[in-house]
C-alpha cells in the first residue's frame, strides 16, 4: 500500500507506464488540436463578413482592400472637381478682353470679337469665315489757303513762268511746274496772249524757246480785288507784255 500511494517513487514504476504516458500525451494533443480547429472555424465564420463599397457597390472580404478602393474613388472625385473649376475659369477668362487676362492663358476663342475697326485686314483661322477689315477713309484735302488783298501766296516766285496750251477758256498761273495751280483768271479779248493757254513759268517766243531779255523783278501777283477783275487783268497783262529771261544770270557767268 505504501509503494502504491507514493507516485514519485521511480523504482516502483509499472511496465506499461511509457505506453500509458504516450497515450495520455496523444489524447491531450488531440484534444488541444480539436480545440484549435474549432477556434479557427469560429474565426473563419467571424472573418466571413462582406464589405461593400458605397460608390460602386463592390464587395470585399477584407476591410483593407475596401479602404484602398475607397481612396481611389476619392482621388477620382477630387480630379473631377478640379476639372470643373478649370472649366469655369476658362469660361470667365473668355468673357474678359484679351489685354486684361488675369492668369495669362492663351485665348482659344475667336479673336475677331475684340478686333479694332481700323486694324489691318487679317485672316483668322478660328473664325467661321474670313473677314476682311475695311481700311479707314482718307482724310479730305485741306481747303485752299484764303488770301486777302494785302497777303500774297507763299508759293509765288519771280521769273518762273512759261506758256502751255493745256486749258482753254481760262488761264491758270502756277509758280513752278511741280506746284499746283493757285490762281485762275479769265482773260478778256484785249489780252496779248491768245485764249486757251496756261501761263506757267517763263514766256516762250515764236521760235518755241524762252525769250531772252533783261531780267526784271516785279511784285507778286495779287488776287482779283473787284467783281470784274480789272486790277488783276491789268497786272497780268503788264507782266505778259515784258519778256522775262531767267537764263541771263547763267550766260553772264
Swiss-Prot record:
Phenotype on disruption: Lateral organs with serrated margins. Irregular shape of floral organs. The double mutant han-2 jag-3 exhibits reduced petal numbers, more serrated sepals and narrower petals.
Tissue expression from the record: Expressed in the emerging leaf, sepal, petal, stamen and carpel primordia. Not expressed in the apical shoot meristem (SAM).
SUPFAM superfamilies: beta-beta-alpha zinc fingers
Metal-binding keyword on record: yes
InterPro entries linked to this entry: JAGGED/SL1-like (IPR045320), Znf_C2H2_sf (IPR036236), Znf_C2H2_type (IPR013087)
Induction details: Stimulated by GATA18/HAN.
GO BP annotation list: abaxial cell fate specification; anther development; carpel development; flower development; leaf morphogenesis; regulation of flower development; specification of floral organ identity; stamen development
Disulfide bonding pattern of the chain: none
Record GO cellular component, one term: nucleus
Location(s), subcellular: Nucleus
Composition bias type Basic and acidic residues, residue spans: 16-26
Chief location bin: nucleus
GO molecular function: DNA-binding transcription factor activity; zinc ion binding
Subunit structure: Interacts with GATA18/HAN.
Protein name per the record: Zinc finger protein JAGGED
Origin species: Arabidopsis thaliana
Gene it is expressed from: JAG
Amino acid at each position: 500500500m505504501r509503494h502504491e500511494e507514493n507516485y514519485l517513487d521511480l523504482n516502483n514504476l509499472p511496465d506499461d507506464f511509457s505506453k500509458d504516458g504516450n497515450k495520455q500525451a496523444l489524447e491531450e494533443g488531440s484534444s488541444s488540436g480539436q480545440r484549435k480547429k474549432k477556434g479557427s472555424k469560429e474565426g473563419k465564420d467571424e472573418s466571413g463578413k462582406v464589405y461593400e463599397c458605397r460608390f460602386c457597390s463592390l464587395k470585399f472580404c477584407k476591410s483593407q482592400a475596401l479602404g484602398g478602393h475607397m481612396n481611389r474613388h476619392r482621388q477620382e472625385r477630387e480630379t473631377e472637381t478640379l476639372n470643373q473649376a478649370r472649366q469655369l475659369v476658362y469660361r470667365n477668362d473668355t468673357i474678359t478682353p484679351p489685354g486684361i487676362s488675369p492668369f495669362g492663358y492663351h485665348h482659344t476663342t475667336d479673336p475677331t470679337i475684340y478686333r479694332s475697326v481700323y486694324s489691318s485686314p487679317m485672316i483668322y483661322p478660328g473664325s467661321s469665315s474670313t473677314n476682311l477689315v475695311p481700311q479707314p477713309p482718307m482724310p479730305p484735302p485741306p481747303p485752299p489757303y484764303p488770301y486777302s488783298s494785302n497777303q500774297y501766296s507763299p508759293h509765288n516766285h519771280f521769273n518762273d513762268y512759261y506758256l502751255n496750251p493745256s486749258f482753254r477758256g481760262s488761264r491758270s498761273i502756277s509758280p513752278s511746274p511741280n506746284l499746283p495751280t493757285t490762281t485762275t483768271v479769265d482773260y478778256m479779248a484785249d489780252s496779248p496772249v491768245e485764249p486757251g493757254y496756261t501761263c506757267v513759268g517763263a514766256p516762250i517766243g515764236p521760235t518755241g524757246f524762252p525769250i531772252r531779255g533783261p531780267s526784271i523783278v516785279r511784285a507778286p501777283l495779287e488776287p482779283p480785288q473787284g467783281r470784274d477783275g480789272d486790277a488783276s487783268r491789268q497786272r497780268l497783262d503788264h507782266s505778259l507784255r515784258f519778256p522775262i529771261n531767267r537764263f541771263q544770270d547763267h550766260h553772264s557767268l
